[in-house]
Amino acid sequence: PGTVEAYDMEHLAGDLVGLMDHLASDKAIFVGHDWGGFVFWQMPMRHPLRVAGVVGVNTPHWDRAPADPIELFRQRFGDKMYIVQFQDPAREPDRIFGSRVEQTFDAFMRKPLAPPPDKPTAPPIAGVGAAAKTNLAFPQMIAAYDAKFDPRTPILSAEEKKVFVDTFTMTGFTGGINWYRNFTRNWQRSKGLDLRSKSTLGVRA
């Protein structure tokens, strides 16, 4: 879809209902990981009669933020944080990623570095910056990225990477980035939605 609004929660949840209708399925168990989990948590709030269960891997249900999430991201991480940058009406991040498709997947599809020997309990090192504000400036990271200087191990074979590169060379990144451009809209339009009355089970792993 060409419009930003086509990627908001109402449309994405509606797409899942449309898929179920196409498959003649009255109910489904939805399993989502990371950002996909956020979409699936919308289902029992927006379409409760179509939901047999929801599993969020890495994404528990969060209550509605007390303020516009874009402003919260900006306050905590600064203007260079990738989600904040994605709001740019000039769509500069789309251009950066779209003109460096192979670089983008070279950078993101790698294993993190192991913790230093003197700090065995430290979190893995992603290798893209020294601080949160630097780590999250993804457009600038990709613009300056050179795989020759990246010590991390790729997680994709050349054949697997080619699938991603060929696909995004054809489609561009705007559709995916439009997901982030709906954060404010989703927040504005989710007032009154509540999952706390439903049966939920949180399992930490």
Name these PLM-found stretches.
Residues 2-31, 35-205:
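Flexible "cap/lid" subdomain of the alpha/beta-hydrolase fold that forms the substrate-access gate
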